[in-house]
Amino acid sequence: MAHLLFLPILQLLLLYCTKSAQAQLNISIGSSLTPQGVNNSWISPSADFAFGFLAVDGNSSSYLLAVWFNKIADKTVVWYARTSSNGKDDTIPVQVQSGSVLKLADGALSLRDPSGNEVWNPQVTDVGYARMLDTGNFRLLGTDGATKWESFGDPSDTILPTQVLSLGTALHSRLLATDYSNGRFQLKVQRDGNLVMYPDAVPSGYLYDPYWASNTVDNGSQLVFNETGRIYFTIINGSQVNITSAGVDSMGDFFHRATLDTDGVFRQYVYPKNIHARPLWPEQWTAVDVLPENICQSIQTMVGSGACGFNSYCTIDGTKNTTSCLCPQNYKFIDDKRKYKGCRPDFEPQNCDLDETTAMLQYDMAPIDRVDWPLSDYEQYNPIDQTECRRLCVTDCFCAVAVFDKASSTCWKKRFPLSNGKMDVNVPRTVLIKVPRSTNSPSVFSSGSSKWKEDQKYWILGSSLLFGSSVLVNFLLISVMLFGTYCSITSRKKTQLSQPSNNSGLPPKIFTYSELEKATGGFQEVLGTGASGVVYKGQLQDEFGTNIAVKKIEKLQQEAQKEFLVEVQTIGQTFHRNLVRLLGFCNEGTERLLVYEFMSNGSLNTFLFSDTHPHWSLRVQVALGVARGLLYLHEECNKQIIHCDMKPQNILLDDNFVAKISDFGLAKLLPVNQTQTNTGIRGTRGYVAPEWFKNIGITSKVDVYSFGVILLELVCCRKNVELEVLDEEQTILTYWANDCYKCGRIDLLVAGDDEAIFNIKKVERFVAVALWCLQEEPSMRPTMLKVTQMLDGAVQIPTPPDPSSYISSLA
């Protein structure tokens, strides 16, 4: 009876051993694969990799012959078969339909389509068997065990640990993530010993000027991705040039790969094999190093479009190591799925037959923040001011963009197509792009002159009639003209009182009080209350039903009545992605109202201090946005604006959680005792710079101090002052953060936040920047330009001194 009980166990053991043995067996002559059914791939012994047919983008009618990571849900492809295109040097991916067969027979491996036509073979004979190795390498071997062909020797866009690229080989990026055709970039191990990265003209394959090189001509040997995860280029004398510098994680715990991605960046990725063993790592591919660090800056060719397509610009998301291509205002992608094709205007091109006045009425020059197209110049002027630079472009039908450099008083005009576009925090020039003017907007170049010409036309017409008519008619005409002149002068005076001239963009719209009362439903829904008044939600009665936020200024100081229009003009001239846009205003009787775009996601105060902490990447995005908005206010707009009351309540979030600063430009309008109850300073407790309490001048550094507090709050997801914390040392965040930084325990600030812990180096950088912003002495604080550079990782950050170290010396 016992032997009967033991029999099933023995059978299971034999079955297990048989399957294990089969996993190690060679792929023998006569074996075959088909795209559909269970026999569609050959698996490596560990099942980490597979070779066979993979549906292209989930499309069951088209299959790729490939090698992929078999244990990862998205089956990440690391190699795919390619064949020459009509006898040309360039290659195309091998994609077949169901019914095709891959067969190892007669000493060769051959892929045939449903009609029996051969579509691919690796051009080797006398093959005895094949192997799919645990390294991800698919090999064909002779009967003697010698390698006849291997996928590692014919790379596509990816290399794996233990893979070596010898002289004359190259990686080709894909065209798109799901289009395996040769893309726009190559990484070549040249026969002259140099490792070079090139932009590639699609579809011709012409190589533009390189954007990175190892500079090892006559010395380089091979590109190595070794078994420990290091990637380096070997030199003939035995030395090595590191290609990536990432700290390598355990090969046992992570899958590794390095890919020349579709954006031209060579990235080294890791993926946790066991998410339970590595709980802090996301279950996805994470880039641990990139080359080059900034593709937008690296590519700049006289021929070709640059990193992105023509008329677009390139931007880097440092938090995710990703590259994006964007279209400027009033432009859209030619093909949304193939953004490398560039952008086109979504308006009619300027007609060269237009006279200057008509051109200025139909077109405007809109500023673009931190974007530049360094090439495409066709005209230069010097010396010149910005207004004239604008005029010269808007009246020139060939001009698409004008660039003005204030320091040198120089203007450049650029024409289509715009190339090498890039977004960069260090763009020192004002970039203006031509866009259509809305039909109801007055000219940016003083509407007065065109109105004067219009008046002159009617005066001339009137004079002609006057001399050619009877006395009675002349008398009536004179009466009408005198009355018209009186009305015109009266109207012009009213216009001058209610709307100052605007020379830098579309002016804010003038609303009547009744319009805003109707839009807000009688000022019913309160969005917030601040020092300058109450903010109400409203909706315009336009074709879009535009949601708005209406600020009713209730405590305007008497001497600021005349300043109101000047300040509105200043605010109305600010155009930036990270500033809440002023749509219009009301200056009727004693009523002073400002109309802003509505921010659907509310304030940073609500967003940050809720029960659920926002993701680290989103907090980073907000921090960078606020920094760039302040940089614009301090250094880039026509008239410097010091906010004086930076705090989370004055930072709003739009539909995409883009941070936008509100309430800027209002400091001059408010009595000093209205910006903070019971104090003689402007600002809010906890965010106020020390110099407010001293008899020294107030500069933009007060905003830098406030930003330092906000930055720490963003890092830690808590308020600066929390009286209910268990540890008394943590009550004031600025003090606690300084203590943690000095002790090397930054991790305590983000305890329980796995995403932040994973990015602890960036957390440390942000805390260091915040501590520099919080220096007691204003001159020790960085400018917002330096702050943005430090946050972006563009400059080294020296160790910040203790923020309170100056207190004793100032006492």
Curated annotation (Swiss-Prot):
Enzyme Commission identifier(s): 2.7.11.1
tRNA processing is among the record's keywords: no
Chain residues that bind ATP: 527-535, 551
Active site: residue positions: 645
Disulfide bonds, paired cysteine numbers: 296-314, 308-325, 327-343, 389-411, 393-399
GO MF entry, a single one: protein serine kinase activity
Domain PAN: start-end pairs: 352-430
Extracellular compartment segments: 24-464
Chief location of this protein within or outside the cell: membrane
Signal peptide per UniProt: 1-23
PROSITE patterns named among the record's database cross-references: BULB_LECTIN, PROTEIN_KINASE_ATP, PROTEIN_KINASE_DOM, PROTEIN_KINASE_ST
Reaction catalysed by this enzyme: L-seryl-[protein] + ATP = O-phospho-L-seryl-[protein] + ADP + H(+); L-threonyl-[protein] + ATP = O-phospho-L-threonyl-[protein] + ADP + H(+)
Its job: Involved in resistance against the herbivorous insect brown planthopper (N.lugens, BPH). Member of the BPH3 (BPH resistance locus 3) cluster which contains LECRK1, LECRK2 and LECRK3.
Protein name, per record: G-type lectin S-receptor-like serine/threonine-protein kinase LECRK3
The organism of origin for this protein: Oryza sativa subsp. japonica
